[in-house]
From Swiss-Prot:
Single Gene Ontology MF annotation: peptidase activity
Protein name in the entry: Uncharacterized protease MJ1657
UniProt EC number: 3.4.-.-
Family that this chain belongs to: Belongs to the peptidase U32 family.
Organism for this UniProt entry: Methanocaldococcus jannaschii (strain ATCC 43067 / DSM 2661 / JAL-1 / JCM 10045 / NBRC 100440)
Keyword Zinc: no
Single GO biological process annotation from the record: biosynthetic process
Length: 332
């Protein structure tokens, strides 16, 4: 299955569904493939990403019906990393239960959540739950915790995308579906990840007038200083999806804060499992890096064979640094 980012407005959904149907006709391998779209719902509770459009329940209901007519699952993302404890107050519990009951009534297929208590509330309301990547599931112990809650799926922390041994161990010991982010290009083991998620969670829910995004700017700065950090980002190239088939069930395309034209480009590349050109154009990372760097996707052919057995002891290895010199060029 492919899980595709959706900016939230009805017109974008139509474009995504049309693109899926078009590719199904062209590519015979996709005729039996399953699809879902996921959309942020930042109202009050918040999400862990920037949000372009905030659909209301009436809008969501229309979109859910449209998606189902085209055999596309519809997932709503309510994955704030922090909601200030309001979900543990009587008023908060009542309000969240009301939200979940509304989502159930309009036919949403699943909700993506990162908080264990919200998972319990959602399941009590009859909703299927996908554990968000913001839950940072990067070990078997964490995966078992969520699997015991009988969730529909777990989205693995992208930091283990190239740790095939960990993914294999999780696959062999959980019964739920596993979902993996394919084009997220955050820093490997980013030390600012949870703080950045917290920032978005509060900014989306409370409309905080932030002066600037420190974490975003620092992310850019670090990768201009050390370009090998881009190579070390745990992205999965379209051509390398085949290495994950059998290990995971769902390939998640990140980027719901991007314009629909960008999303269409990424859909085409990953569904066709091929991209010739600048890989930066597919990666969900600061746009400034795309404009600054050219990452030759063909120069990365075969790199995954090394990454599959890499022990990630970077101080004793220069593979990514040497690959960056070969594949990654400054445009200007």
């Amino acid at each position: 299955m492919f899980s595709i980012s959706h900016p939230g407005d009805f017109e974008s959904l139509k474009i995504i569904v049309n693109e899926i149907n078009k590719l199904r006709k062209i590519n015979k391998k996709l005729k039996k493939e399953s699809f879902e779209v996921y959309v942020g719902f930042p109202e009050f509770v918040g999400t862990g990403r920037a949000t372009l459009y905030k659909p209301n329940f009436e809008d969501l209901a229309k979109q859910v019906n449209y998606a189902k007519k085209h055999n596309v699952r519809f997932e709503v993302v309510i994955n704030a990393s922090c909601i200030g404890g309001m979900h543990l107050t009587p008023k908060g519990i009542s309000y969240i239960n009301w939200i979940f009951s509304q989502l159930k009534n309009i036919g949403v297929d699943s909700v993506a959540l990162s908080d264990p208590y919200l998972v319990d509330l959602a399941k009590n309301n009859g909703l299927e739950v996908n554990v968000s990547c913001i839950a940072l599931v990067d070990s078997l112990d964490k995966a078992l915790f969520w699997d015991e809650k009988e969730v529909y799926a777990i989205t693995l922390d992208s930091s283990i995308n190239r740790h095939f041994d960990i993914i294999q161990e999780i696959r062999e010991n959980v019964s739920c579906k596993l979902k993996i982010l394919v084009n997220e290009a955050c820093l490997y083991k980013c030390p600012m990840r949870i703080q950045h998620f917290n920032f978005f969670s509060h900014a989306n829910a409370q409309n905080i007038p932030a002066l600037d995004d420190y974490y975003y700017n620092k992310c850019i700065n670090l990768r201009i200083k050390k370009k090998e950090l881009i190579i070390k980002s745990p992205f999965i190239r379209p051509e390398d999806l085949k290495y994950y088939k059998g290990l995971v069930d769902i390939f998640k395309i990140s980027g719901r804060s991007h314009p629909i034209g960008w999303i269409k480009r990424v859909i085409n590349a990953y569904l066709n499992e091929r991209w010739d050109g600048n890989l930066m154009e597919l990666l969900d990372c600061p746009r400034e890096l795309e404009h600054f760097y050219y990452l030759d996707n063909r120069a990365l052919d075969g790199a995954i064979e090394y990454w599959k057995s890499c022990n990630k002891l970077c101080s004793k290895c220069n593979f990514c640094k040497e690959l960056a010199e070969k594949a990654l060029k400054v445009k200007y």
